[in-house]
Structures are given as C-alpha cells and as structure tokens.
C-alpha cells in the first residue's frame, strides 16, 4: 500500500513537472518570437531562411514557415514546445526501458532533471550557458528539432546492434530515413555518428573475423543518404570569395577570445570543465559496470569523436567564430548524459536490492 502511494505521488509530481516544463517552453519560444529588440534566439533568423547560412536552404525554414502560416507566433511556439516535450518523453522512456525498477513518475522526474541540469540561460551575462557543453539549448531551433531525431536514431541503432548478424529491415529503413531527415535539419549528428559507426563496424569486423560482413555493410549503408546530403549542404554553404570551408583550427589565424565555444577562451574552458563533472564521475567510478554496456560505450565513443571534432576543426571565412562544429558535441553530450544517468540509476537500484 505504501509503495502504491509513493508511486502515485511520483506520478503526480512527474506529470505536474512535465506540464510546467511544457508551458515554460511554449512561453519562452513565444517571447523569443515576439521580441523586437536584441535577442539571443535564432528563431527569427531561421524562419527568415538563414538556418543554412543566408541560403534559405533548410528543412527547418520550410517547417517553421509552414507552422507559422497555420498558427502564427503562438502556433510556432506550441510546435517548438511540443518538440521539447518529445525530447523529455524520450528520456523518460529510455530510463524506464533500461531500468524498469524506476516507476513512470520517477522516470519523468529524472528526465526533467537531466534536461534542466545543464540549461541555465544567461541572457544578460557574459556567457550564455553555465557549461560550454550542454544537452539542452533553448535559442537554436535547428538543435531543438534535431534533438529527438538524434535520440531516436541512437536507440534504433542499438536495436539493430542487439540483433547482430540478423538485419531488421524495418528498423534499418527507419534509421536510414531518420538520419537523413536529421541531417536535413542539422548535419551535426551525422557528422559524428558516421565516423563512430565506422569505428564500431571495424571493431566488429575484427572481433567476428569477417563472419558478419553482409550485416556490417548494410548497417554502414544507413549513413550514405545523409552523407550525400552533407555534400550538397557543403556546396551550398561554402561558396563565395571569403575562403569559406573547413580546416584544422591550429592551421588558421584566429582570435581565441572571439571563439564562442571551445577550449581557447576563459568562459568556454571553465564551462567545459563544469560540464564534465557528472559524466566524468560515471566514467571513473562505475567502470566495472559500464564496460559491459554497449549503449553506454557507444555514447562515450560518440562524445569522444564529437569533442575531438569540436576542438580540432573549424569553419573558415565569415563563419569561423560561430562555433558550429560544436553542435555535434552538444547533441552527443545529451546522449552521454542520458546513458550516464541510466548507469547511475542501475547502480543505485543494485545497491538497494542488496540491502
């Protein structure tokens, strides 16, 4: 009886927290849409066609204009708030699936904690966020819309990996479509997922001595449409006479204090260190537990590759100081944060069961 009361209380708190979170997201996006002064939000720019530079070449622009045409500012705010809510629910679903001892209400509360813990917005401060690496970002519509797609794609990949050697064609097709659509919205996730998948498949090839080559080849093909789309996007973005393109940051002349994200200016460097405290503690303290968890190890691989790309690569020309190569680190941190939380909950419930 006491257990049922506790679960009902957690359900109530979880639903209340989710409702408040959803309303706050709608309010925030609406305020950003109607702002007439200086604002940090990218919504107006993305709606005007500048989600891919100044080209108008963006699925986000098409979607935002369509939603705005139907519902105006309020409808657009509700749409973006619904996307934020979807991300929150995916977190809760993943926690419940991995740690079934966590009741649904508690899963919602843990999901809220994960989605808020790195997302302190500072519109009047010297730096936008507490934490240069954060999973939740409120001002960038392309990232907001990428977030649930990247999470679903991550779990679809895990479901395919669970059936090693036996390709699940529906999941394969769904993953291919999701990665392509996610790339059309923002290529940052595929820019990390593709090399991480290559590493995972090469390791699998060595481990199985080539006994699962057809499965590995087909799984590798999931990224091909997205890579083709990346090439098209690059041709659209990196044109003109300002030497636009991509390069190793150490080979370029740049002002460290102008770089929005990275390890070169004071705010970003200290924010980065703050961001790594929790996930770093899980890596060190729960090593014996997570070394057998494929989902966690793949999320760690994704983040390691994304962090390397963010530190070592930069766009050149007029986009050099925008920090766009760090978007991959943000979305992969989001996935690593979720998997780290799952590892923590698994550890806590194991200790509780032994009492």
Regions found by a protein language model. Give the residues of each.
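Membrane-interface alpha helices of multi-pass inner-membrane proteins
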Residues: 171-187, 193
């Amino acid at each position: 009886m006491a257990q049922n009361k506790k679960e009902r209380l957690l359900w109530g708190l979880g639903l209340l927290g989710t409702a408040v979170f959803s309303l706050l997201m709608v309010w925030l996006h609406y305020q950003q849409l109607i702002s007439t002064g200086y604002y940090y939000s990218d919504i107006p720019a993305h709606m005007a066609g500048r989600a891919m530079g100044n080209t108008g070449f963006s699925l986000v622009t098409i979607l935002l204009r369509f939603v705005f045409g139907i519902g105006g500012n309020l409808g657009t705010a509700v749409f973006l708030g619904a996307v934020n809510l979807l991300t929150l629910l995916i977190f809760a679903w993943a926690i419940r699936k991995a740690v079934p001892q966590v009741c649904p209400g508690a899963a919602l509360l843990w999901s809220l904690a994960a989605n808020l813990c790195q997302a302190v917005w500072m519109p009047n401060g010297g730096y936008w966020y507490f934490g240069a690496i954060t999973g939740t970002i409120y001002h960038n519509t392309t990232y907001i819309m990428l977030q649930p797609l990247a999470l679903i794609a991550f779990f679809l990949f895990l479901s395919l990996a669970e059936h090693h050697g036996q390709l699940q064609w529906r999941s394969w097709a769904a993953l291919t479509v999701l990665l392509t659509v996610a790339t059309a919205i923002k290529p940052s996730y595929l820019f990390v997922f593709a090399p991480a998948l290559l590493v995972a498949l090469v390791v699998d090839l060595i481990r199985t001595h080539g006994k699962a080559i057809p499965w590995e080849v087909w799984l590798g093909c999931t990224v091909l449409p997205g890579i083709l789309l990346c090439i098209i996007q690059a041709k659209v973005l990196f044109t003109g006479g300002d030497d636009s393109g991509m390069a190793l940051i150490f080979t370029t002349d740049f002002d460290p204090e102008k770089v929005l994200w990275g390890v070169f200016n004071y705010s970003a460097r200290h924010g980065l260190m703050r961001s790594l405290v929790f996930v770093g503690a899980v890596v060190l303290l729960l090593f014996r537990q997570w070394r057998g968890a494929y989902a966690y190890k793949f999320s760690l691989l994704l983040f390691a590759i994304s962090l390397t790309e963010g530190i070592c690569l930069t766009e050149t020309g007029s986009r050099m100081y925008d920090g766009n190569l760090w978007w991959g680190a943000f979305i992969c941190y989001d996935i690593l944060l979720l998997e780290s939380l799952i590892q923590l909950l698994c550890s806590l419930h194991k200790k509780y069961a032994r009492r």
